[in-house]
A protein has these predicted regions:
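Sec-dependent N-terminal signal peptides
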Residues: 13-22
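N-terminal pre-catalytic segment of deacetylase/amide-hydrolase enzymes
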Residues: 2-6, 17-18, 27-111, 117-130, ...
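Glycine- and small hydrophobic-enriched segments that form the cores of compact globular domains
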Residues: 140, 147, 153-155, 159-162, ...
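Catalytic domains of cell-wall/extracellular-matrix polysaccharide-remodeling enzymes
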Residues: 170-269, 273-291, 295-296, 302-313
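Active-site metal-binding loops of divalent metal-dependent hydrolases
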Residues: 113-116, 142-143, 167
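A short beta-strand-loop structural module common to alpha/beta enzyme folds
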Residues: 135-143
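Structural preference for beta-strand elements that scaffold enzyme active sites
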Residues: 108-110, 134-136, 160-164, 201-203, ...
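Acidic (Asp/Glu)-rich catalytic clusters
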Residues: 125-132, 147-166, 195, 223-230, ...
């Protein structure tokens, strides 16, 4: 009986060793998977940091490029002064803002509307109010002569939207004849906005964009002068293409979504003149889609880093 017990023990020893080794291996696997998870988390965090750093570097480079271009234009402008000052620089001293200390670059969608106000603007304001979204309206001075236009402008200001200058006349051939002619037009609509709302506009959009088929002889000088005065101007990187004539609401929506999906920071060009019925019709569905996709919206301010067109070679 004693011999049989010893025999059983001998058989049990290898089994115990196998079980012990299996337990050790299982522990090592647990540690290994835990370590792998920790390393994976660290890698993901580092990748996110790298992406954020690249974005910061890109923003800094864009700001540096803008400042460099501005300095070049100022230098060119200064070299042409016969007595240290060009005549148009003495015009409208009230059109001077305090120096800008820097730009912000938020990853948001900036909705902008040109050529209003009109009855379309009322529809657009209603849609924006229902969704608590603020936008930017670059207004035309000739639309502010009516009581309706003035009421709409006051509503823009009261509801927290940004009011920017577009033009008084929207006559490209006349406003782009010279820097002085542009300033004369700018001053007219600036005064109207201030008188109606008490708001002094700080941003603007050149009719046709900063570089267009009408201002080729003066655009560098004109941009330098407006920047010298402290105003920020904005082109766009997403277009609804609603300025091209008759275009459906579905096409406007597709154009906007395609552009917005391509950029982390979008300045969207749309129009709110009376003829742009499909723009107002497209807006609710467009906004609801973007909201569902997690996009955030903001109005432009003078401190928003501009999107601007490149100068032609």
């Amino acid at each position: 009986m004693h011999v049989q017990t010893k025999s059983k023990k001998k058989h049990l020893l290898p089994l115990a060793l196998i079980i012990a080794m299996a337990a050790v291996m299982a522990g090592l696997c647990v540690v290994s998977w835990s370590e792998r998870g920790r390393l994976q988390n660290e890698l993901e965090v580092q990748q996110q940091l790298n992406v954020a750093q690249r974005r910061v570097q890109q923003a800094e480079q864009e700001l540096s490029d803008l400042q460099e271009e501005y300095d070049k234009l100022l230098k060119k402008q200064d070299s042409s002064k016969p007595n240290g000052e060009i005549a148009y620089q003495t015009l409208y001293p009230e059109l001077m803002l305090d120096p800008l200390t820097g730009y912000t670059q938020e990853q948001k969608v900036y909705l902008t509307f040109d050529d209003g106000p009109s009855e379309r603007t009322i529809e657009i304001l209603d849609v924006l109010k229902q969704r608590d979204i603020k936008a930017t309206f670059f207004v035309v001075g000739s639309n502010l002569n009516s009581e309706q236009g003035q009421e709409i402008l006051r509503r823009m200001a009261d509801e927290g939207h940004t009011i920017g200058i577009h033009t008084d006349s929207h006559q490209y051939r006349s406003i782009y004849t010279s820097v002085e002619d542009y300033l004369n037009d700018f001053k007219k609509v600036y005064d109207k906005v201030y008188e109606i709302t008490g708001v002094k506009p700080e941003i603007f959009r050149f009719p046709g964009g900063s570089v267009n088929g009408y201002n080729g002889d003066i655009y560098q000088e004109l941009i330098a002068e407006m920047m010298r005065r402290g105003f920020s101007y904005y082109d766009w990187n997403v277009s609804s293409a609603d300025a091209t004539g008759s275009i459906s609401a579905d096409t406007i929506t597709k154009n906007c979504l395609s552009g917005i999906h391509a950029y982390r920071r979008s300045i969207v060009l749309m129009h709110d003149s009376a003829a742009k019925k499909t723009t107002a019709q497209a807006l609710p569905g467009l906004l609801d889609t973007l909201i569902a996709e997690g996009y955030e919206f903001a109005p432009l301010t003078r401190e928003t880093l501009p999107v601007t067109f490149a100068y032609p070679d």
